[in-house]
Amino acid sequence: MPSDRQRKIRNFSIIAHIDHGKSTLADRLIERTGLISQREMQAQVLDNMELERERGITIKLQSIRLIYKAKDGQDYYLNLIDTPGHVDFTYEVSRSLAACEGAILVVDAAQGIEAQTMANVYLALEQNLEIIPVINKIDLPSARPDEIKREIEDIIGLDASEAPLISAKDGLNIDDVLEAIVKNIPPPTEDEEAPLKALVFDSYYDNYKGVVAYTRVVEGTVKKGMKIRMMATKKEFEVTEVGVYSPGPIQLDQLSAGDVGYIAASIKDVRYCRVGDTITDALNPTEHSLPGYRKVTPMVYCGVYPAEGEKYEDVRDALDRLQVNDAALVFEAETSAALGFGFRCGFLGLLHMEIIQERLEREFNLDLVTTAPSVIYRVTKTNGEVVMIQNPANLPVTQEISVIEEPIVKATIMVPSEYAGIVIELCQDRRGEMKGMDYIEETRVNLHYELPLNEVIYDFFDALKSKTKGYGSLDYEMKGYKPSTLVKLDILINSEQVDALSFIVHESKAYARGKGMCEKLKDEIPRHQFPVPLQASIGTKIIARETIRALRKDVLAKCYGGDISRKKKLLEKQKKGKKRMRQVGSVEVPQKAFMSVLKLDT
């Protein structure tokens, strides 16, 4: 049974597809409960990274406590945990849902249910959460709330008859949402007297307090001065501060079962406070840790190098700092003949990779070069040994390879039916295999495909959006590995291989990719005093070539008329000089050339 204190607590998060109005609804709830006055209000209050506001997306989950006076005259504590919507950040969503009893499902009144909405709903159902559907953007002329209600009931199977119809932008019917939270989301019921058990669902590094952990107290109580133990690492610390965010940090005496807040304990090393860990009382520990999060596996790898070699340690420090609150980022040191010392980093997807790169550049003032993104391939060698390859440079020679397998994803693509043909064409072009197709209603269709992850990570999402005028939506999950005819494509500049530009590609696309890279490099590398050949090769076979023409001095400028043999002699002399220069000269590849080639459309 919930205690009197717990009866007043509601822990919930907001889930939705990108752009369905999740952060705007969070802003309105904050405003309506009087937490921030309209004067201090700024759009996307919970998106406190500059990058999040700029891109209009939520990247990191945030938590905040609201106090709401309900119609029954009681004050309720509502702990809102904001979640991202992009497919790359599904792990952030699963983390925040683990700390809640309920979720608000925001659906756009014009767009309806999309692929990512479905994926997040399934995550919430797995955690046995109470889901409240809310239909947003009813102020739009194209809004069709009644149809959307039917869609929610038919596709997800949730009763949407009492779903609040709101406009988060205009602040319409926001009270209905708050009342629905109080009425429908169950209060926490855990035991306050049991030994402490708290779930770390996020953390960040503070220069003064050390690592600060966002936690949901599941059982027991945590107070200042108490000795706590991290169950995964067995490390012990003394709590220096506990409190809640409302919206800034507010210190409290204690956090008890059902509360969502933060704990600071002068933890200096980010590795000791892992997201998904359980915090317990060091003197009276709980027997079992909470069921941890599944460890997230990176899907995409790329090399990250400092533009100036001496900044190597700074990059390591920055990656360490980012890793504390981004459980999905993994990295290890590597070296490249072309770029020097750097790191091989693993990400969840291309958006995640871009975000990390931008955060490194902005928050830590680093100048970086990144190599082409690649996925993990499984290679069976002729001697039966199986190796996982994440860096194309480590691929064994062709003679040693028996089979190369590439990762395959199970993709669900939702599109308006008039775009189905274009999307099927796109999937076929990306070597997709159709597994099924069903109509949700007359106007929308659900396509089920198996696609190579290599084809999805580059620009599949962008291509899908542009071909469906923004209406297509995608959700995917790993399925496994499948044998494929893949080759390693090397780029040679002035007959020297540049390891940072090597990548693994399907045989059918090797020529187009190789030719595209040579053409792009030709535009980007400045001309030298000698001709520079640019070649794309598979093993020893050259499949594409471009030549950067030499800069030439006009050696005939001072020959006015005169004997032809004199001119020939001067030209011959110049030719010999160029030949000698080509043998000893080295070609500088500017950083801009690396960047533009790696952004090459695939």
UniProtKB/Swiss-Prot annotation:
The reaction(s) this protein catalyses: GTP + H2O = GDP + phosphate + H(+)
Name recorded for this polypeptide: Elongation factor 4
UniProt-annotated location(s): Cell membrane
Membrane topology, record value: Peripheral membrane protein
GO biological process: positive regulation of translation
Gene Ontology cellular-component terms listed: plasma membrane
Transmembrane stretches, start-end: none
Cross-referenced InterPro entries: EF-4, EFG_III/V, EFG_V-like, EFTu-like_2, G_TR_CS, LepA_C_sf, LepA_CTD, LepA_IV
Function: Required for accurate and efficient protein synthesis under certain stress conditions. May act as a fidelity factor of the translation reaction, by catalyzing a one-codon backward translocation of tRNAs on improperly translocated ribosomes. Back-translocation proceeds from a post-translocation (POST) complex to a pre-translocation (PRE) complex, thus giving elongation factor G a second chance to translocate the tRNAs correctly. Binds to ribosomes in a GTP-dependent manner.
Chain coiled-coil ranges: none
Lipoprotein found in the keyword field: no
Family annotation (CDD domains): EF4_II (cd03699), EF4_III (cd16260), LepA (cd01890), lepA_C (cd03709)
Domain tr-type G: 7-189
Family, per entry: Belongs to the TRAFAC class translation factor GTPase superfamily. Classic translation factor GTPase family. LepA subfamily.
E.C. numbers: 3.6.5.n1
Keyword Nucleotide-binding recorded: yes
SUPFAM superfamilies attached to this UniProt entry: EF-G C-terminal domain-like (SSF54980), P-loop containing nucleoside triphosphate hydrolases (SSF52540), Translation proteins (SSF50447)
Gene Ontology terms for molecular function: GTP binding; GTPase activity; ribosome binding; translation elongation factor activity
Principal location listed in the UniProt entry: membrane
UniProt keyword list: Cell membrane, GTP-binding, Hydrolase, Membrane, Nucleotide-binding, Protein biosynthesis
Binding site for GTP: 19-24, 136-139
Species this protein is from: Alkaliphilus metalliredigens (strain QYMF)
Enzyme superclass (EC): hydrolase
